[in-house]
Curated annotation (Swiss-Prot):
Residues 1-25 form the signal peptide. CDD domains: LbH_MAT_like. Belongs to the transferase hexapeptide repeat family. May be involved in the biosynthesis of 6-O-methylglucosyl-containing lipopolysaccharides (MGLP). Regulates host peroxisome homeostasis in response to intracellular redox levels to favor mycobacterial infection in macrophage. Induces the expression of host peroxisome biogenesis and proliferation factors as well as peroxisome associated enzymes. Inhibits the induction of host pexophagy mechanism by down-regulating the expression of pexophagy associated proteins and adapter molecules in infected macrophages. However, during increased oxidative stress conditions, it induces degradation of dysfunctional and damaged peroxisomes. Its EC number is 2.3.1.-. GO terms for cellular component: peptidoglycan-based cell wall; plasma membrane. It comes from Mycobacterium tuberculosis (strain ATCC 25618 / H37Rv). Keywords: Acyltransferase, Repeat, Signal, Transferase, Virulence. It comes from the Bacteria. This is Probable acetyltransferase Rv3034c.
């Protein structure tokens, strides 16, 4: 059960996953004092209380009974693994080698420890992966055939974090969610990348930055996007379909569909769609030449 009253507004849809922008996303500011008072009020009134604004919270140390209390095992999006269809797939694809068996075991342990996290299909987990979602405050949904490499850290402190199908994460990536992050289908992420949907406030020089609260804005990463090594994606970013983010880019704002963006801050330097359309004649000539070669081979 989500105790945050975030609200929603209409959004766009990438693939099969609806993308919604929570109300007040650009002005989601909380302070440490407000957070403490709200959490005390929540502890006194129980899990049915509504928080007026989201405090800074952490999920580390959440006891197992809290995770099971927020279980989503009956959610229709939750995949069922021990079925005849899954057994047929394992046999048909010979997915019973040691590599697969280790990952089945990791997924089983993960599901038993995190029944409040939605997995819509098979998820392949590497070594040392940390996936956290605050029970009753955050919703984490992982799509089908997602590969999460070694030592990735995925934290849904609050709000919503959604992975599409066939997402591939390299190693040592960090994703921090306090409001709303969506990663579309078939996104390819290299190593040592960072994605977050919040910033620390730093306006008041008389108050420590850690006590000034945070500002939150949603992040959208479109399907079929390639994120290079050591890329940072900051709050309030919308990345279109089929984009390429060059290594070490710092991305903030809107990146149009099929763009190649590089630099810090990231700037669009090329459009893949325009390049593809411009090379149509060249591709046609190449196809005709190959067809002519095959025709001559067949005539011999």
């Amino acid at each position: 059960m989500n105790v945050l009253s975030l609200g929603s507004s209409s959004g766009v849809v990438w693939g099969r996953v609806p993308i919604t922008a929570p109300a007040g996303a650009a002005t989601g500011v909380t302070s440490r004092a407000d957070a403490h008072s709200q959490m005390r009020r929540y502890a006194q009134t129980g899990p049915t209380a509504k928080l007026s604004s989201a405090p800074m919270t952490t999920m580390w140390g959440a006891p197992l009974h809290r995770r099971w209390r927020g279980s989503r095992l009956r959610d229709p999006r939750q995949a069922k693994f021990l079925t005849l269809a899954s057994l047929k797939w394992v046999l048909a694809n010979r997915a019973y080698t040691p590599w697969y068996l280790v990952r089945y075991w990791r997924l089983l342990r993960f599901k038993l420890a995190n029944p409040h996290i939605i997995t819509r299909g098979m998820v392949f987990l590497g070594k040392g992966v940390e996936i956290h979602a605050t029970p009753e405050l955050a919703q984490l949904e992982i799509g089908r055939w997602v590969h999460i490499g070694d030592k990735n850290t995925i934290r849904a402190h609050e709000g919503s974090l959604r992975f599409g199908d066939k997402v591939v994460l390299g190693r040592d990536n960090v994703i921090n969610t306090y409001l709303d992050i969506e990663i579309g289908d078939s996104v390819l992420m290299a190593d040592w990348c960072y994605i977050c949907d919040f910033d620390h406030r730093m306006d008041d020089i008389t108050l420590p930055i850690k006590d000034q609260g945070i500002i939150k804005s949603p992040v959208r990463i479109g399907p079929d996007t390639w994120i290079g090594v050591k890329v940072s994606v900051l709050r309030g970013t919308t990345i279109g379909r089929g984009c390429v983010l060059g290594s070490h880019a710092v991305v903030r704002g809107a990146i149009p569909d099929y763009s190649i963006a590089v630099g810090a801050p990231a700037k669009v330097v090329k459009n893949r769609q325009l390049s593809w359309e411009a090379s149509a004649a060249q591709r046609a000539e190449l196809a005709a030449a190959l067809a002519d070669i095959e025709r001559k081979k067949a005539a011999r």
